Swiss-Prot record:
InterPro entries: GPCR_Rhodpsn, GPCR_Rhodpsn_7TM, TAAR, TAAR1, TAAR_fam. It comes from the Eukaryota. This is Trace amine-associated receptor 1. Keywords: Cell membrane, Disulfide bond, Endoplasmic reticulum, G-protein coupled receptor, Glycoprotein, Membrane, Receptor, Transducer, Transmembrane, Transmembrane helix. The gene is TAAR1. Intracellular G-protein coupled receptor for trace amines, which recognizes endogenous amine-containing metabolites such as beta-phenylethylamine (beta-PEA), 3-iodothyronamine (T1AM), isoamylamine (IAA), cadaverine (CAD), cyclohexylamine (CHA), p-tyramine (p-TYR), trimethylamine (TMA), octopamine and tryptamine. Also functions as a receptor for various drugs and psychoactive substances, such as amphetamine and methamphetamine. Unresponsive to classical biogenic amines, such as epinephrine and histamine and only partially activated by dopamine and serotonin.
Amino acid sequence: MPFCHNIINISCVKNNWSNDVRASLYSLMALIILTTLVGNLIVIVSISHFKQLHTPTNWLIHSMATVDFLLGCLVMPYSMVRSAEHCWYFGEVFCKIHTSTDIMLSSASIFHLSFISIDRYYAVCDPLRYKAKINILVVCVMIFISWSVPAVFAFGMIFLELNFKGAEEIYYKHVHCRGGCSVFFSKISGVLAFMTSFYIPGSIMLCIYYRIYLIAKEQARSINDANQKLQIGLEMKNGISQSKERKAVKTLGIVMGVFLICWCPFFVCTVIDPFLHYTIPPTLNDVLIWFGYLNSTFNPMVYAFFYPWFRKALKMILFGKIFQKDSSRCKLFLESSS
């Protein structure tokens, strides 16, 4: 049986997977990391370079892309080694730094999603006062909260060792070992992490997007009723309103679906594992962590790839046109359709 540390009686057990299995895992996780880095970097470069994209909403998306890029750059590579080897080769201090950074950036990404839902609510439901309510100052506050709260929560919990408060005996007797870097939560810290990083921002997203859907549906019905009264282009207008309603439902479904599929399994296991006496296998926990990482991989696709300006910006980046003079002033969309 292979071990992670020279002193066998205190060492974590290394997995005994074949080289082919290990190589396949490395390839898959490296692909996820590369996709995360490239997708979010394109969003960062696009919004930074093109002046037409310098809007409060886009700076919020830019900040989220930065969080997701850092997650792919600073966290995922080390998690890849830990997941493939079931060992941690980078020391106990760096384990704490890595775990804190992981929790911070993952939570910050979810916080950004929550604030973007608030932005979309005012854009759809209160368009006349949208620019007054969601200005650059408000967005700066959103960005500050999205970074600072997860940072204080993550680094405070890990470095003060609050994550296994009340379960020290279980942790040091049955979980802790040399050459490992597992994320451990007690009953209290597991519930706290679930509430802070998932339930509260997730509930905000769910309630707001459901409200947006109801209002969009009501607006589509009002347009349909007006068309029936006026009897002008009824069939065409009705088709358009139904198409818009279907598109709204599809977009909101994708947003919530990706978020829930990626993060719900991990946080549910995090909150129930202490109550099940830590019977969830570490391998399953690793898989669920990577499912959560996938949310940062998909964020550029869900929140940026759907924007009309993105395809043109992507084409200009790929063909090197952003290096041309005054390319930053290029019009990516008509002002009325932004």
